[in-house]
């Protein structure tokens, strides 16, 4: 094994190359009891343009191998070969009737082949050996397979993931292809998806980046297994792969395991792809894109950017920061703050072979696109001429440094950087050099790249209202492909079972020792967590007032950040914060309003003084309210173009009736009438509420307490006690189906709501967790297998029992479920889901896997150091005095299938659910739909204000 020199950026990354050429990156981090494991393959959609092969292959990599997922591969292979031949015939056939006949033959062969399939065995084995969050993703340039796992199962993880890459088998092909259709339908219903696809096509043609990752509908209809196998043989070779581990493992122990398992992957070098040159724009090239949003106008300027490894990237990042930054002091930010534009932002992406830079401008409703473009060019010219101060330039470099340091400080974010770097063909040493180049940047570098890339050759894009046609995929008449051995185990599984495993108990949050908890004043709880990684602090002040109690907070969080004080304008305040390397954010959720301050501990005192002055002296400006009005107008128009948002609102109404947040929220009329002083008074009231503060940094507790008390005092009257509202669930006396018609969408979204009785004991609550896993959470759940895996009736499914906080355990509970399906499959999906709810099948063989899944979820979700105090505060707010996962795991280890069955019979079986359906109602058989309950056609004014 050849070893490269180790690198060190905040945390040590060791790079190795195995004898077969596979690259390994190892990062030991013992701060959390988990390991992130990933395999990155340098092959993406650009290597199979417009076919969707790279993406569909990613799906098939979950179906097992010659040893995993089968009871008899030799017998199964005979049928799989016949299926492959039929797909070749299908791709060569144009006659529609003959194509239907071939597909039915494939269906019959698939049903026979399923007699040998053990569905989801790979997922079950990953779970059995400490895994959670199993997933994958396909990009233009690469594909990544990843999950978290408990450290004691490193050997099993390596065995499974290397086996997966050596001998994959493309079983259950037909049903998974239908699932990919569902995924495509789901994407096509997203309001901007088709528009972005058209823009990518215009921008990148003739490069493969011009085509969608998922592929065209035409190519998806004509899949060739032979092409997929060729793709695998070409790109899934050792020199084209990287193994990434970050977390709680011992490198010396891990290396021999990795060498033994991953060195088995065949050697090889992928074929060099032909270089496709993207021509430069010639002058101001024009195009339009359709977006189904009336009222809103928009323009965009698209410039040629740089590929991922280009040395100009750091300077371009600073140039972009001069236009947009986290403090809202960029030149484009100011156009919005001053209400000259409704929206303006710069963004971009650097792929491996090309990049793009886009600047989007949204004029005010009464202004023109031409005026918006002129404003954008004026600000670009300022950057090109060097019209920015050294202070701003240095502050943006400091902002980049802060971002890099925080990205490296925990396993989750650091591992994503490792994946990105490897996928771009970089080493960790390259990353260090990038940081050094960024630190060494000069103002002249930024001016040079601004003039180089923001020139007269660009793509001018104008939005027009409209939709692109979508190709409806007809529901196939296939019979379900239901394997007979759903709970069997393979010989390979038995072999893994014989490996010795060290017993390691999960790690729980310790309320006493993990953080310091102080109560320095009435109504103030201060959590202090030491930061031993860098010198960046966060101070979060969470006030006990949320959107449920005070819906106007939604407006407040959009308005207050636009203001200044009597002595400091918005621009002066945020420029000073920017110079210090600090940021200020204001957010609201159901139960709290949170002020989050971030910066370097060296600037802690000055940052808090600035924020304190703002909080106590914020000054109303009614002119800024017009921004809220414009935003509300556009949001109202956009809302009913998104089936996901409409379904969420209708489901809220079904659960909470008049207390739905979509009915209590301020209406457009309310927004027009509200005064600035009203929101400022509300803000001043909110920051006097009981406060839970979270400091994470390097400063001593005494100093943090002193500055917090001095800067954020509630005044002589003290803090106002929390109200802690909780909404009551709506009950129904008979089954109903709430139906909302959206004719332009492909996918119908289905929600299920079933109000249930309270669960006052911990044992009942724990059983509800296990029931949820069994019924509707994860790839091995009943819903996933019966609805998606066997029948291809949905891309995404979920079902779970939802509980109020433990302190309110005497309140009612509810069962909820969700799926989205092609509109003409709605009744089929409902029938399967309804059957599961009313006649839940029992699989006692799954109980051990369920318990293991729960243990893994607890262990692998132990928080990063910056999030520990927030987790403890949430537990305490819910009524716990210790980490509740400790009691949960002790309890479920003793549970059996009988516990799940008793829970189901007592709390779910026999209850009539309420269904919510949002989508194309014209493609639903109303007579069959009525068998699920009284059909209620509902108008949007009933559930959306």
Predicted regions and their residues:
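A common structural junction motif
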Residues: 163-171, 261-269, 377-388, 612-622, ...
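Carboxylate/His-rich catalytic cores and anion/metal-binding grooves
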Residues: 181-188
């Amino acid at each position: 094994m050849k070893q490269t020199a180790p690198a060190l950026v905040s945390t040590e990354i060791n790079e190795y190359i195995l004898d077969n050429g596979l690259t390994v990156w190892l990062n030991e981090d013992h701060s959390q009891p988990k390991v992130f494991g990933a395999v990155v393959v340098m092959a993406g959609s650009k290597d199979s343009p417009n076919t969707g092969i790279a993406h569909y292959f990613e799906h098939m990599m979950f179906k097992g191998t010659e040893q995993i997922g089968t009871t008899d591969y030799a017998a199964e292979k005979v049928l799989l070969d016949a299926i492959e031949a039929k797909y070749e015939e299908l791709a060569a056939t144009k006659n529609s009737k003959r194509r239907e006949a071939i597909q039915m033959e494939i269906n019959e062969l698939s049903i026979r082949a399923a007699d040998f399939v053990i569905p989801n065995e790979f997922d079950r084995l990953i779970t059995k050996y400490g895994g959670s969050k199993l997933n994958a993703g396909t990009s233009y340039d690469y594909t990544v397979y990843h999950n978290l796992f408990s450290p004691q199962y490193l050997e099993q993880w390596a065995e499974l993931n290397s086996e997966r890459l050596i001998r994959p088998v493309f079983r259950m092909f037909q049903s998974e292809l239908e699932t990919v259709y569902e995924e495509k339908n789901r994407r096509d219903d997203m309001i901007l998806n088709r528009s972005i696809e058209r823009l990518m096509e215009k921008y990148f043609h003739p490069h493969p980046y011009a085509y969608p990752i998922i592929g065209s509908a035409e190519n998806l209809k004509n899949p060739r297994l032979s092409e997929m196998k060729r793709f695998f043989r070409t790109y899934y070779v050792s020199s084209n792969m990287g193994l990434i581990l970050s977390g709680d493992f011992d490198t010396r122990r891990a290396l021999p395991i990795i060498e033994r398992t991953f060195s088995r992957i065949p050697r090889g070098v992928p074929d060099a792809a032909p270089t496709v040159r993207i021509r430069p724009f010639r002058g101001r090239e024009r195009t339009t894109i359709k977006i189904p949003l009336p009222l809103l106008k928009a323009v965009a300027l698209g410039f040629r950017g740089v590929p991922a490894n280009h040395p100009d990237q750091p300077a371009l990042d600073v140039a972009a920061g001069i236009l947009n930054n986290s403090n809202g002091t960029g030149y484009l930010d100011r156009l919005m703050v001053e209400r000259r534009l409704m929206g303006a932002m710069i963004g971009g992406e650097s792929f491996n072979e090309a990049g793009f830079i886009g600047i989007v401008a949204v004029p005010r409703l009464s202004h023109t696109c031409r005026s918006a473009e002129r404003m954008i060019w004026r600000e670009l010219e300022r950057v090109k001429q060097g019209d920015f101060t050294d202070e701003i330039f240095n502050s943006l470099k400091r902002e980049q440094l802060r971002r890099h340091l925080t990205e490296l400080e925990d396993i989750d974010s650091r591992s994503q950087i490792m994946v990105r770097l490897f996928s771009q063909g970089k080493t960790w040493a390259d990353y260090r050099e990038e940081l050094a180049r960024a630190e060494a940047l000069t103002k002249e570098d930024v001016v040079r790249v601004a003039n180089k890339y923001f020139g007269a050759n660009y793509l001018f894009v104008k939005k027009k209202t409209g939709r692109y046609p979508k190709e409806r995929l007809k529901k196939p008449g296939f019979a379900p492909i239901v394997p007979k051995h759903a709970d069997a185990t393979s010989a390979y599984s038995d072999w893994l079972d014989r490996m010795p495993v060290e017993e390691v108990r999960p790690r729980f949050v310790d309320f006493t020792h993990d953080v310091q908890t102080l109560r320095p004043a009435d109504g103030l709880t201060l959590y202090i967590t030491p930061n031993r990684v860098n010198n960046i602090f966060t101070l979060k002040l969470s006030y006990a007032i949320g959107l449920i109690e005070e819906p106007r907070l939604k407006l407040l969080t959009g308005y207050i950040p636009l203001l200044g004080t009597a002595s400091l304008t918005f621009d002066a305040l945020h420029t000073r914060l920017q110079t210090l390397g600090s940021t200020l954010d204001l957010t609201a959720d159901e139960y709290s309003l949170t002020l989050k301050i971030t910066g370097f501990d060296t600037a802690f005192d000055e940052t808090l003084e600035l924020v304190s002055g703002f909080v106590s002296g914020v000054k109303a400006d009614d002119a800024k309210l017009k921004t809220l009005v414009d935003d509300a107008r556009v949001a109202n128009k956009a809302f009913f173009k998104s089936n996901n948002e409409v379904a969420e609102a209708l489901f809220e109404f079904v659960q909470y009736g008049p207390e739905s947040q979509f009915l209590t929220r301020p209406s457009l009329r309310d927004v027009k009438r509200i005064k600035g002083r009203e929101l400022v008074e509300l803000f001043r009231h909110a920051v006097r509420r009981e406060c839970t503060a979270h400091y994470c940094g390097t400063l001593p507790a005494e100093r943090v307490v002193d500055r917090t008390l001095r800067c954020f005092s509630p005044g002589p009257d003290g803090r106002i006690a929390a109200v802690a509202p909780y909404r009551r669930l709506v009950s129904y006396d008979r089954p109903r189906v709430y139906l909302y018609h959206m004719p332009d969408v492909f996918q119908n979204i289905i929600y299920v709501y079933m109000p249930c009785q309270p669960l006052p004991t911990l044992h009942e609550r724990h059983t509800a967790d296990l029931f949820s896993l069994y019924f509707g959470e994860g790839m091995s759940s009943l819903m996933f297998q019966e609805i998606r895996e066997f029948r291809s009736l949905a891309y995404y499914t979920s079902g779970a029992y939802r509980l109020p906080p433990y302190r309110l355990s005497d309140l009612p509970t509810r069962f909820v479920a969700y799926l989205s399906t092609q509109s003409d499959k709605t009744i089929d999906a409902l029938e399967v889901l309804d059957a599961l709810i009313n006649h839940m099948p029992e699989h006692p063989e799954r109980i051990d896997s369920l318990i293991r899944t729960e243990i893994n979820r607890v262990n692998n979700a132990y928080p990063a150091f910056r999030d520990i105090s927030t987790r403890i505060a949430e537990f305490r707010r819910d009524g716990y005095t210790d980490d509740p996962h400790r009691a949960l795991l002790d309890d479920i280890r003793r549970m059996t299938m009988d516990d799940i069955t008793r829970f189901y019979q007592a709390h779910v079986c026999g209850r009539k659910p309420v269904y919510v359906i949002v989508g194309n109602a014209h493609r639903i058989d109303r007579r069959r739909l009525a068998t699920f309950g009284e059909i209620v056609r509902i108008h949007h004014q009933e559930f959306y204000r």
